[in-house]
């Protein structure tokens, strides 16, 4: 209902109380039985309208405040904070549960850059077909699904035969129509160049595939209780293997697999951790070739590692056989098929 505003009598009363109580607001407020805040508001209003001790003949309407009540707003902030804390706790080392004890693999799609003239579509299609026809092989997107040029870099669309609309259609195809059994999507720097793109992906994510910005830490859990911890990021801090080793040491070797993309190169490294468990460090190259930026900086145009496959064996006879890495979808799919046939 509309605010009736202060009456002349209320404002006059506030002025009179002020002068009758030694011009001390707290005493005037107590005299009128008002809170200090309410009294100060009435006094300010009366002064603004020129009220003086005595009777006034003019009544001016008072308008309600158009901002939220402070306490109500603080209550809302508290709920938002709690929900954010709950979300962060849920996504930190979330669990992907395998309902049997057969070995499984994750095909880590390196930066796809769909729509780019340099996207190796032929190789991408081959890898997708292999995944669709290999039992136990799942897909994970390391990020940079599209070029997604934004701000000043939007001019680079002139160098490709694609529009932003077409890029988004390609991303939808990759997510929903390519037939890939996804378990994870990460958002890279290119995905975030246009703020609406990641929101669009989340909106069409009908299968509720985990979609996280930049990094995901999760556990692959098998029926027999075996667990494999994965620390995947579009890129980990630093670009050398030393940095990934240091990250592993700094985090107490909290993962079995450290995976990254971003730099359009690939590598695999395996070593034994301090607890006698194998550690796998990998970077997938991605599908963007013929990259002028890389050419200008003199980077090698690597041919392998578009995707990297990690295979997890929950029934391995040797601890060192628990995790294996492969530099291509074809190699990983072949090994996984052979391994599952022996279980």
Where are the regions a protein language model picked out?
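Acidic, histidine-bearing metal-coordination/catalytic regions of metal-dependent phosphoesterases
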Residues: 1-105
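Polar, enzyme-active/binding microenvironments
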Residues: 49, 101, 133, 137, ...
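Beta-strand-turn-beta hairpins that frame and shape the catalytic cleft
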Residues: 96-106, 217-231, 276-279
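An acidic-aromatic substrate-binding cleft motif
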Residues: 98-115, 119-124
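Residue-level marker for buried hydrophobic side chains located in beta-strands
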Residues: 106-108, 139-141, 185, 231, ...
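Active-site glycine-centered loops adjacent to acidic/histidine catalytic or metal-binding residues
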Residues: 111, 143-144, 188, 234, ...
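Core catalytic region of metal-dependent phosphoesterases/phosphodiesterases
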Residues: 114-214
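Conserved beta-sheet core of the metallophosphoesterase superfamily
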Residues: 229-231, 235-339
């Amino acid at each position: 209902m509309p605010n009736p505003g202060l009456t002349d009598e209320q404002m006059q009363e506030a002025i009179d109380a002020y002068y009758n109580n030694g011009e001390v607001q707290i005493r005037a407020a107590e005299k009128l039985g008002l809170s200090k805040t309410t009294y100060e508001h009435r006094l300010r209003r009366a002064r603004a309208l020129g009220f003086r001790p005595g009777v006034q003949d003019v009544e001016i309407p008072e308008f309600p405040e158009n901002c939220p009540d402070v306490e109500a707003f603080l209550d809302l902030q508290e709920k938002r904070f709690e929900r954010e804390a709950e979300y962060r706790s849920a996504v930190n080392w979330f669990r992907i549960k395998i309902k049997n004890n057969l070995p499984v693999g994750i095909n880590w799609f390196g930066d796809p850059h769909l729509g780019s003239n340099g996207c190796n579509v032929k190789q991408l299609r081959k890898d997708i077909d292999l995944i669709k026809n290999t039992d136990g092989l799942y897909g994970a997107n390391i990020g940079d699904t599209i070029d997604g040029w934004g701000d000043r870099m939007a001019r680079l669309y002139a160098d490709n035969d694609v529009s932003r609309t077409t890029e988004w259609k390609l991303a939808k195809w990759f997510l929903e129509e390519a037939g890939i059994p996804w378990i994870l999507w990460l958002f890279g720097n290119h995905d975030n160049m246009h703020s609406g793109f990641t929101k669009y992906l989340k909106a069409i994510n009908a299968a509720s595939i985990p979609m996280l910005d930049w990094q995901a830490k999760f556990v692959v859990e098998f029926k027999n209780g075996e667990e494999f911890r994965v620390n995947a990021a579009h890129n980990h801090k630093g670009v050398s293997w030393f940095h990934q080793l240091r990250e592993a040491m700094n985090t107490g070797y909290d993962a079995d697999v450290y995976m990254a993309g971003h730099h359009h190169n690939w590598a695999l490294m395996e070593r034994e951790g301090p607890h006698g468990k194998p550690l796998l460090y990998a970077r997938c190259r991605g599908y963007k070739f013929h990259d002028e930026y890389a050419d200008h900086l003199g980077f090698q145009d690597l041919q392998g590692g578009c995707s990297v496959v990690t295979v997890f064996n929950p029934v391995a006879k040797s601890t060192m056989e628990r995790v294996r890495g492969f530099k291509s979808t074809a190699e990983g799919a072949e090994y996984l098929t052979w391994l599952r046939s022996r279980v």
